[in-house]
């Protein structure tokens, strides 16, 4: 499929689903290989709308069914998770207009991060272009540049999300700056549960593929399996990489490392040894960073330890002296009452119910046009 055909297909699916549910398109928030996220309005309320499309291909029915299970697991868990540090999923949909569709579209209405993701935020700080960050100005008393206080401000919240995941027996497996969205009250909220793992006591956790530059060494072991009690330490490794990125505006691994770690001709054992050495070398480099709190340097080095058993656990992070320094003052900045999120949920339910009535009563000409186009790409 050419890029033009792919774009045309995306537009047809988007218009069909927006019209079907009576949502109003606002803008594109992000696009990936299998789906996209849009900003939409439901009456006067703004939400994020994620659409994932799956294609049924000849001879690959098993892969297709596996992908369906994966998407349904992601969406269902996202809807169940209710925490201060998780993006809230309000409603999920599965398009089933055709009995034997070539394409299945899953979509979810989610809380929209009001500002951006953490990677975007860091980008504009390092570029010095704060004009793009006007929404953050009320926080500039504490966040005037990406200094130790700023990094501590974010580190504290990411640790809270780690605590939330562990308490729910979950491992996110994709900890990176772009998966942390900045929402109401300047709260960092974790998103994208596509690689989520459920951790069962005394059962090993099998790791699935992740972004190459955030894969922990245990991804390169022969079995790719870890003990249940160590599962959260995969995310703690990712936390260490996020701290390093905030401090340097660089990923710990570079394109040269990608050539080595992505090379199919190199064995997993060789990749494992290569990454271990790289992490030990980087740890020595971090020790020599100037104008950086010793506590932060120690924290990064501990989190990126090649040996999973030697990384700190969540309890260690919650009690970390550097993280908790002056935390009461920082806490005042992003404190938010739970009623704001409850209000968001109620507003969506109200507007969703109103829309259901509108769909039944409105003129159907436009709806039939998009439905016809949608059926064309199914054949």
Language model features: what each stretch is:
Residues 82-92:
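Conserved HxN/HPN-centered segment at the entrance to the catalytic loop
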Residues 154-155:
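Activation segment signature within eukaryotic-like protein kinase domains
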Residues 306-330:
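Terminal C-lobe "cap" of eukaryotic-type protein kinase domains
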Residues 26-32, 37:
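Protein kinase glycine-rich loop
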